[in-house]
Amino acid sequence: MKKVLVVDDSETIRLEVSRTLGQAGFSVLEARDGAEGLAMATKHPDVSLLVLDVNMPVMNGLDMLERLRQDPTTADIPVLLMTTEAEDRLIERAKKAGAKGWFIKPVKPEMLLMATNKLAR
């Protein structure tokens, strides 16, 4: 079973995304912020995909993505970002850091599943 780590400070969104992925047959781990997510990704390098919120306390999703790419154990894990903002500067930073895609919230379940099935390793 492929494992996905969902990182979002909104419990509602985290649960919605986790439920969608769980019902599709993925094993789902959850974290509340980028620092917790980074620790979990490092502890679980067998994660198939990361789904990160951009705007979170403690450590945001872009900072987490950049830190993941610096660690050989997590550098190759595909990452999808979720955001309420579609600013060019955020998209450029996400691309440069190696994000495989991003969604504007609220995320449509069918779009999430299509991307997850394509990217999960």
Regions found by a protein language model. Give the residues of each.
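Short hydrophobic/Thr-rich beta-strand motif most characteristic of the beta2 strand and flanking loop
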Residues: 25-32, 40, 103
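Receiver (REC) domain active-site loop signature in two-component systems and cognate sites
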Residues: 56
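Active-site beta3 strand of CheY-like receiver
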Residues: 45-51
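C-terminal output helix
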Residues: 89, 107-116
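Short, glycine/charged-rich "phosphate-handling" switch motifs in NTP-dependent
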Residues: 100
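Charged docking surfaces used in two-component/phosphorelay signaling
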Residues: 15-23
